[in-house]
Each structure stands twice: as structure tokens, then as C-alpha cells.
UniProtKB/Swiss-Prot annotation:
Entry GO CC: host cell nucleus
Protein's name according to its UniProt entry: Protein Ac102
UniProt subcellular location: Host nucleus
Quaternary context: Interacts with protein C42; this interaction suppresses C42 'Lys-48'-linked-ubiquitination and subsequent proteasomal degradation. Interacts with proteins P78/83 and E27.
UniProt keywords, alphabetically: Host nucleus, Late protein
Positions of region (Disordered): 1-35
Keyword set includes Membrane: no
Primary role: Nucleocapsid protein that mediates the translocation of G-actin from the host cytoplasm to the nucleus, which is fundamental to infection. Participates in regulating nuclear actin polymerization as well as the morphogenesis and spatial distribution of viral capsid structures in the host nucleus. Suppresses 'Lys-48'-linked ubiquitination of the viral protein C42, thus forming a regulatory cascade with C42 to control P78/83 availability as an nucleation promoting factor (NPF).
Length: 122
């Protein structure tokens, strides 16, 4: 080895293993108070009744085939509109072309991710 690399005694086997041991035994960093408050705010927003999302609307709908919630959502989403007519007719299958399929999958993905806010226009 080159002498300049080993000038310090930090690279000895004992010092290296001690540094690794210390790193492993260190407790995980606690999230900051600001991060914790942001998480609390997000949970409160999700749990408030004022912020009704498509997922909560569909879950709380007691009509057969969830038609009432789909009627409300069909004013906002083409995918919901594509699902509404076959659901109202109680069809056993839903025929969709390629574009309608993409729209329905996008709608269902948004419902699953809980990202659609319901806008009631009455």
C-alpha cells in the first residue's frame, strides 16, 4: 500500500468494525414535528365528512350495483358514464371498446387511489 493512504490509524480493522457496529446500533431518526403534523392533518382531512371522495361515495352507496353513486360520478367522469348504463340495465357483461376501457380503468384507478373529489351540482 501507499504510505499516504495508511497515514491515519482510522482504517484499522478494529476501528472499521467499531464504526459499523455504531452505525447498526444507532436508533432510527425520529420524524420531525412538522412531518408528524402534516400526517395528522392529512388523516383529519381524509376523515372529515366535508371532503367526500368517490371511494367514500361508492362505499356508502346502498343501491344495487352502486347506481346512485355512479349517476353522481358520471357527470365528472367518462369512465363512470361508461359503467352506468350497463349497471342500470343489470347487464351480466359490459362491452367496452379500447378507449372506453382505458377511461374505465383510469376511473377505477382514481377511485382506488382515492383522488377524485365529488362535486355535487344541485
Amino acid at each position: 500500500m501507499i504510505a499516504s493512504i495508511n497515514d491515519t490509524d482510522m482504517d484499522t480493522d478494529d476501528n472499521m468494525s467499531q464504526a459499523r457496529r455504531n452505525r447498526r446500533n444507532r436508533p432510527p431518526a425520529r420524524p420531525s414535528a412538522q412531518t408528524q403534523m402534516a400526517a395528522v392533518d392529512m388523516l383529519q382531512t381524509i376523515n372529515t365528512a366535508a371532503s367526500q371522495t368517490a371511494a367514500s361515495l361508492l362505499i356508502n352507496d346502498i343501491t344495487p350495483n352502486k347506481t346512485e353513486s355512479l349517476k353522481i360520478l358520471s357527470t365528472q367522469s367518462v369512465g363512470a358514464r361508461s359503467l352506468l348504463e350497463p349497471m342500470q340495465a343489470n347487464a351480466s357483461t359490459i362491452k367496452l371498446n379500447r378507449i372506453e376501457t382505458v377511461n374505465v380503468l383510469d376511473f377505477l384507478g382514481s377511485v382506488y387511489d382515492n383522488t377524485i373529489q365529488v362535486i355535487v351540482t344541485e
